[in-house]
Amino acid sequence: MAQHDFAPAWLNFPTPPSSTKSSLNFEKHSENFSWTENRYDVSRRRHNSSDGFDSGIGRPNGGNFGRKEKNGWRTHGRNGTENINHRGGYHGGNSRSRSSIFHSGKSQGLHENSIPDNETGRKEDKRERRQFEAEDFPSLNPEYEREPNQNKSLAAGVWDYPPNPKSRTPRMLVIKKGNTKDLQLSGFPVAGNLQSQPVKNGTGPSVYKGLVPKPAVPPTKPTQWKSQTKENKVGTSFSHESTYGVGNFNTFKSTAKNISPSTNSVKECNRSNSSSPVDKLNQQPRLTKLTRMRSDKKSEFLKALKRDRVEEEHEDESHAGSEKDDDSFNLHNSNTTHQERDINRNFDENEIPQENGNASMISQQIIRSSTFPQTDVLSSSLEAEHRLLKEMGWQEDSENDETCAPLTEDEMREFQVISEQLQKNGLRKNGILKNGLICDFKFGPWKNSTFKPTIENDDTETSSSDTSDDDDV
């Protein structure tokens, strides 16, 4: 297994010149053995490998593996240790003790030669590893901060050159201290540390109290407090977040604002904490009130609009020639219908001008009600039929009115008979027909009778289309 397979890319060990000396020394001693020459050629080609070919062939029991990995992968004297192991590899086991089997004198010299190489490699390795740990984990050994950065020029990248190298090490230290303090002091609802300032919202759970970052313990080091707020500004609020598992960003923003005094920041934390749920509680009923009022207005407006349009259509109809049999019934209902119409007219004058294009309809309605005051007989049945037709998917199309043929007297009589039957039998309840009499009714004549005046009068056409659009919306 080659070393570069599992070593990270930033772990660059420059190969020291001592390993080349040991390999030259080994070349002198290995002239007598052909198999060692072959092996050395292989290992020279692959001098990076920590294991060579021994792990599979020479040492089936893996006797020296752990030790050799320590020397071969970690240290700089890789060639020395490898080549010793190749010499003794075929005889299995611990290569240092058995390296004198073949040609004991020469291999003894080789053994002595490579020992100091290994020791120096180990020392370098320890020093580099300590420096690496200190660089990446400054909170583990604070002495590293006072040492000058020696190795920063060797490797490049984010590991060695962070975006802000000056503030990096103290900031990481502050994180460590803050975390230990928080973990020691917080038995989860921490009310004592906040200088007896509980969260103002009484309904909020005690988790909110634990979310305040707790600089309220009187700060012994003002510099640490400043650096902590600086850390919050830079954006490392994840430390507090990971401690509590819940992120409350209002508190971090407020602590970042107040750098110098600690009590102000705690007050602001409490304020921001308590204000958000209170605002939410206040806003929700306000929203529901608005929507409720709007829906009520709209529904009432639509109801009034339906009533007025039904009256209009009936007036058009009765004006077309059906004023014969209505007098007796009209006298009976005239008072109530006039009152309804007055109420509706007042309501519409207040409401309808908010919608677009309906002012003409108001004026027309007023003119009509003054000219034909006694023609509101069939309003209830018409309203029911109209509602049913709309539920079945029929729409008022003012464009198709010109194609309709003029009404005949037979059609008008048929319509009157049906409507009178409906009213006498009392088959209408809540605006819904209970039996299928509406099926015998021909849609064409009713539609034509409704829209006959609109052919003569252009204003009526526009007003009816406007009302139908508003009603469909």
Swiss-Prot record:
Name of this chain's protein: Vasculin
Residue numbers bearing the Phosphoserine modification: 49, 274, 276, 322, 381
Alphabetized Pfam families for the sequence: Vasculin
Comp. bias regions, Polar residues: 94-117, 193-204, 248-286
Entry function: Functions as a GC-rich promoter-specific transactivating transcription factor.
Gene of this entry: Gpbp1
Quaternary assembly: Interacts with GTF2B, GTF2F2, RNA polymerase II and TBP.
Cystine pairings recorded for this chain: none
Ranges where the record places region Disordered: 1-25, 44-170, 186-341, 450-473
Family, as annotated: Belongs to the vasculin family.
GO annotation terms (biological process): DNA-templated transcription; positive regulation of transcription by RNA polymerase II
Swiss-Prot/TrEMBL keywords: Activator, DNA-binding, Methylation, Nucleus, Phosphoprotein, Transcription, Transcription regulation
Modified residues annotated as Omega-N-methylarginine in this record: 87
Signal peptide limits: none
Keyword Cytoplasm: no
Any one GO MF annotation of this record: DNA-binding transcription factor activity
